[in-house]
Amino acid sequence: MAVEKLSPGMQQYLDIKKDYPDAFLLFRMGDFYELFYDDAVNAAQILEISLTSRNKNAENPIPMAGVPYHSAQQYIDVLVESGYKVAIAEQMEDPKEAKGVVKREVVQVITPGTVVDSSKPDSANNFLVALDYSDGLYGLAYMDLVTGEFQVTSLEDFALVCGEIRNLKAREVVLGYALPEAEEQVLAGQMNLLLSYVQTALDDVQLLGEELSPMERQAAGKLLEYVHRTQMRELSHLKKAQHYEIKDFLQMDYATKASLDLTENARSGKKHGSLYWLMDETKTAMGGRMLRSWIQRPLIDEARISQRQNVVEVFLDHFFERSDLTESLKGVYDIERLASRVSFGKTNPKELLQLAATLGNVPQIKAILQGIGSPHLARLIEGLDPIPELAGLISSAISPDAPHIITEGNIIQTGFDETLDQYRLVLREGTGWIAELEVKERANSGISNLKIDYNKKDGYYFHVTNSQLAHVPSHFFRKATLKNSERFGTEELARIEGEMLEAREKSANLEYEIFMRIREEAGKYIQRLQALAQTLAAVDVLQSFAAVAEQQHLVRPVFTAERRLQIEKGRHAVVEKVMGAQSYIPNSILLDQETDIQLITGPNMSGKSTYMRQLAIIVIMAQMGSYVPAQSASLPLFDAIFTRIGAADDLVSGQSTFMVEMMEANRAIRQASERSLILFDELGRGTATYDGMALAQAIIEHIHHYTGAKTLFATHYHELTALEESLEHLENVHVATLEKDGQVTFLHKIEPGPADKSYGIHVAKIAGLPEKLLERADSILSHLESQDTGLGSELPTASRPKQSQVAEQMSLFAEGTENPVLTELRDLDIYNMTPLEVMAAVAELKKKL
């Protein structure tokens, strides 16, 4: 259809739509939001709503779909959850007063990273990330638009950037145009992120300060620009950007956090079965968010850790006070989110009452902590600001029975505003006047069933049935005729109605004005509310630590400056909670100054992986400031944890199990220090036996000679146990088994020395393989053992000269005159390249063959 034939309303739609080509445009028309053209077609499919058309009789009808205004939020949620943007175009004037087309403007763009209203409120953070890049350095900024949290850092490695984005569970990333195309493809393709672009950076001195580097300032500025561009309002709740360094926390990449089930179970994707699930005895949404953050970022500063431990100890020593505290915390609402709604101008009366109720609980919480009388609680007590001015204003102004909707009246309490009270008096007296008038006219007219009714169309009226029409007084005038009755008015009734309607309208308008003033006044306290929220969250998390310590029988760990780690009867607290304390077998571990590496052998399913994860979880809990699951625990402060636990291909990136193993091993070898913890489980199983064994041994030797990190290395290569003879800082341990009458029992107990068998056939039996197959396997095993075809003699040890292998793997890099293509291939640093970069490089080399 030609543009000139469009109606003014459709032309207005197209004019607005061209400014938001990447968003669904919800175009307000009366009581509906309408969508047109491709937006309508696509939205109808996603939202499962009817697709109709505008101008159905035209040659090219315009596709149209719509959703009701009052229930639009649930449809917006579906679109945003599906990864789309939604632009909201509102009517900016009353259609009854409009001259021509009703003026409409986009008032907000809702995106996956900027959701502030939702029909399904969630206590989790929703982070929006911005990136900037120059000369090998990345600036990364992130923000939660609801809580106002705003953090900025610099990173030198794109892998770290991806890991940080994954840790934040971000769904949208804001970019300039400087990021390499291959890296953009990784973000959009492999990580399935929505990419949004801005060219300019907002330089807000108040929010950005002077401490940020130029790259960080660019990233943070682009984030602010995008947020202001989409939200189109003042965002007074945003906190000042805080610089952080990942090296200031216990470093763990995304794969490590996933393999350790820190915030969700890797298999189910649910909270159940994670460390977060175990540790979460918080009573507030703010506490839940802070707990998740502490789990993701354990500390490396012993003083800060001790501060948290001291508070936990105080709470453990004061059971009754802690019980009172938890009860008080149950009455605390999510004031971070409430403060953001104040800032957005979206707070309703019920939410202001929730704010006042929370502030009303603060003095009681403060009194409980003061009553304990511990100096370790001083900082928390100081941060408990009850903001009495705001609490008093809301409590005196807002009616306890106030509705959610701010235009329906009955919001403001009687006695708060004298003028409003006068209007309400007129309404109350008017009701009495109408009742008196009804009695008077019934007596004067002799109509026994005469009564006064009301509806929106006719207002107040006398209701007279047809049988009584002959008795209608002469001063009655007809207002409406029905089948069995008629409706009449009088001058006196009209006067009373006029006074009441005027009072009702003025009362509603005045209530709205008063409420808006109160909401504006509340906006002045946003920073104090946010500071209070942080203190309440910390109190909540620390009481949660105490509750878990009590329930799970945890102990306070001790940190030592020596490189000595000793845990007596340690437990994997999550596994223990799932299994039950009676079923779990604790294990001790000692890695002193003379022992850096434990080489763990034993059958599959015997508990090697649990033993390794147990140590990592204890370290993480300790450096969070929590107590730990052990009889006693003494350990050094670690700067990083590196893991390779569990075998799974990275199908999204097109990387095999072995490639993933090698890349994770490479990260550990390159980045670990002697203050790190390395956990490698069955490294090398993804390739040929000799290759895997050779690589496993070389990696162990490298860690032993050059890294010095505390390391647990589980392996099925029993030949590697000979390394204990040549590597002075390595010791063998194994998982004990009990073999009796042909039956094998896994004891799940770690004992010194190497394992003598792998019991693979027994594991296969447990898995339910056919009996004939198992008998054949046992026969083959007996034959191999009688031939003594062990592989140990084929592997060089650190002190033994290398011997030629009988079955040598073909080399890609043969000696002699070398093809220049092979030279280029060898020089590729594939472990620091993305899969797409590797593919592109190989494609270029292929052209040269």
UniProtKB/Swiss-Prot annotation:
Keywords: ATP-binding, DNA damage, DNA repair, DNA-binding, Nucleotide-binding. Transmembrane segments: none annotated. GO terms for molecular function: ATP binding; ATP-dependent DNA damage sensor activity; damaged DNA binding; mismatched DNA binding. ATP binds at residues 602-609. One of its GO terms (biological process) is mismatch repair. The keyword Nucleotide-binding applies. InterPro entries: DNA_mismatch_repair_MutS, DNA_mismatch_repair_MutS-lik_N, DNA_mismatch_repair_MutS/MSH, DNA_mismatch_repair_MutS_C, DNA_mismatch_repair_MutS_clamp, DNA_mismatch_repair_MutS_core, DNA_mismatch_repair_MutS_N, DNA_mismatch_repair_MutS_sf. Gene3D superfamilies: 1.10.1420.10, DNA repair protein MutS, domain I (3.40.1170.10), MutS, connector domain (3.30.420.110), P-loop containing nucleotide triphosphate hydrolases (3.40.50.300). GO terms for cellular component: cytosol. HAMAP family: MutS. Belongs to the DNA mismatch repair MutS family. This protein is involved in the repair of mismatches in DNA. It is possible that it carries out the mismatch recognition step. This protein has a weak ATPase activity. This is DNA mismatch repair protein MutS. It comes from Streptococcus sanguinis (strain SK36).
